[in-house]
C-alpha cells in the first residue's frame, strides 16, 4: 500500500516486487479520508509505472464517476484508465455497480472470453430504469456547469466563515478541524473528531445534515438551490461562532 500522492512510494513498490504486481487500484480523488485531489503528475506517474511494469492502471470512480464530469475524474484530469469501477451514482442512488475498460481487457469477459461474471442482481430492472433516468438528466446541457457554480459558492462561503478546513474537487467537498491541509492518509489521522462531532450535531440541530464522519465526502446535487447553499453558509457561521472555533 502506498500513500495517495506519493509517487516515489509507488515506484519503490514496483522495484521491490518486480513482476509481481498485477495492477494498481486507486481513487482519482479520495472520498473517505477527506476530499483530496491528485497532485499534478501523480495519476500520470502511476499510470506510466503500471504500463512500464506490465500492470493494469485501475481507477475506482465509485464516488467520482458522473459527479466530477460526464466522463468522471478521467475527463476532468485528462487521463484514461485500463479499467474503471463505477457505483450508484450511475443509477441515481439505486443499487448498481459497473465496470468497463479497454477492449483488449474487456474481451476477456464472458461471453467473448473465458472469465465468467454474473450475480443475482445483475441487470436489475429497477436499477437499470434509475440509471436511464440518471443519464438522461446528467447529459442535459449545463448540469455540470451548475454543479461547479453551486459548489464554488458553498466552498468559498465556508472558507470565508473560517474556523475549519474545507477542501473540494468539483461538487465533492468535506469539512474538518485540525490540519491546515490534507494531501494523504497520514494527514487525515490528525483530524479533530471531537470538534467535528460538536459541529455536526450543532448543524443537525439547525436542520443541516452533513456526513457523520469528518473523513467522508459530501456532494452537491443538481437539485440544490442557491438559497439552500446560502443557508448552509449562514448556519455554519452561527455554529462556528457558537462553538467558539475561531
Give names to the regions the model predicted.
Residues 1-246:
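Conserved N-terminal phosphate-binding loop of PLP-dependent enzymes in the Aspartate aminotransferase
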Amino acid at each position: 500500500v502506498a500513500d495517495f500522492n506519493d509517487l516515489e512510494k509507488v515506484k519503490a513498490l514496483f522495484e521491490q516486487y518486480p513482476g509481481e504486481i498485477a495492477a494498481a487500484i486507486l481513487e482519482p480523488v479520495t472520498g473517505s479520508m477527506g476530499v483530496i485531489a491528485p497532485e499534478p503528475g501523480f495519476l500520470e506517474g502511476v499510470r506510466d509505472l503500471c504500463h512500464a511494469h506490465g500492470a493494469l492502471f485501475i481507477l475506482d470512480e465509485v464516488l467520482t464517476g458522473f459527479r466530477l464530469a460526464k466522463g468522471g475524474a478521467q475527463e476532468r484530469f485528462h487521463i484514461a484508465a485500463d479499467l474503471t469501477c463505477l457505483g450508484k451514482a450511475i443509477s441515481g442512488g439505486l443499487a448498481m455497480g459497473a465496470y468497463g475498460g479497454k477492449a483488449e481487457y474487456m474481451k476477456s469477459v464472458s461471453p467473448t472470453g473465458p472469465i465468467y461474471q454474473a450475480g443475482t442482481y445483475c441487470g436489475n430492472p429497477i436499477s437499470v430504469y434509475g440509471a436511464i433516468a440518471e443519464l438522461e438528466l446528467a447529459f442535459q446541457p449545463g448540469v455540470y456547469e451548475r454543479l461547479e457554480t453551486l459548489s464554488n459558492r458553498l466552498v468559498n462561503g465556508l472558507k470565508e466563515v473560517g474556523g475549519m478546513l474545507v477542501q473540494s474537487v468539483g461538487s465533492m467537498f468535506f469539512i474538518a478541524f485540525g490540519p491546515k491541509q490534507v494531501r494523504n492518509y497520514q494527514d487525515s489521522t490528525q483530524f479533530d473528531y471531537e470538534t467535528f462531532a460538536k459541529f455536526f450535531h450543532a448543524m443537525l440541530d439547525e436542520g443541516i445534515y452533513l456526513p457523520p464522519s469528518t473523513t467522508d465526502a459530501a456532494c452537491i446535487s443538481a437539485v440544490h438551490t442557491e438559497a439552500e447553499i446560502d443557508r448552509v453558509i449562514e448556519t455554519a457561521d452561527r455554529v462556528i461562532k457558537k462553538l467558539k472555533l475561531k
